[in-house]
Amino acid sequence: MQLAVVEFARNICQMKDAHTTEIVKHCKYPVIDTLPEQKTLIREKKYGGTMRLGEYPCLIKKGSRSHLAYLKSRQGKQNKKGDILVQERHRHRYELNNEFRKDLEDKGLIMSGINPERDLVEIIEIPRHPFFIATQFHPEFKSKPLKPHPLFREFIRAALANKKRIKSE
């Protein structure tokens, strides 16, 4: 998800100098960055408390492609608004910088999965694309050979549908 956000910021939002601070520490548009409370720890080289590790909640917005994937697989709990709450596994240090969230959304990037505890973006989508979903978490950590993660299953469905569409053209 992180480099997808960088590319979207550069090419769609016209933020030519957008980057992740993991690669370019002092870039003009740090669309991917560490959380403010992590910065001091990183400066002091105390990396132990700077990673987001383990399982965290993700609220998936009703009407999104991700929502449809989880709905089809009957995973998660639906709230009164129809959003689905799931638990997903993480292992990362950098996040989408919420200072740029509105700019990205205004240009069409959908933030379809949000951590409800910290308001962190977990899933992004580009609706005009046949299948463009990127995640901050690791869906492969909850996938098995005979029970693939809902997003993997939807990706395969979309690929097959696109293949049929191309053959018929």
Model segments located where?
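Amide-donor transfer/coupling interface in amidating biosynthetic enzymes
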Residues: 10-169
